[in-house]
Amino acid sequence: ERLHAQGHPIHVVDALAINTISVADAASLVTDVLRERELRGVVIVAHSKGGLIGKRLLIEDVDGRVAQLIAIATPWHGSSLARYVPGRVIGALRPEDAAIVALEANTEVNARITSIYPALDQHVPEGSQLEGATNIEVAAVGHFRVLSDPEVLDAVVAAVGR
């Protein structure tokens, strides 16, 4: 709401819904939406797995549509806890998952990423610092609770266009 109030158009990709598809498939879906809506200079604001999708978009952005990614509580290095949760959706967040390894290896786009993360994230014990990115740790505690923290909201607004 604050970004919209400052004149930034907001586009939600409803098709992602609860985000149970792979990072690659989700990035492809978002790319299609960006093209259909003829969007350029896009700043993606994403949470958790959404940050992984955003990084893949930056890497594969042959049209130059995405300017920046602001990621909140993103498991850039995976989550060791994903090993203990059955199913492919969470399992894809294991540190050794091929998609995680590939995204981690590609550092060329990291300078265009702002990673905002809580002081303690019970779902991402490895943390959300990303080498080469602008890293902002906030005092909030919790993987989801961070989304409503005023300090995080301030950091997102400040990061747009940085």
Regions found by a protein language model. Give the residues of each.
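C-terminal catalytic-base region of ester-bond hydrolases, centering on the histidine
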Residues: 107-162
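Serine-dependent carboxylesterase/thioesterase catalytic core
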Residues: 2-15, 20-111, 123-124
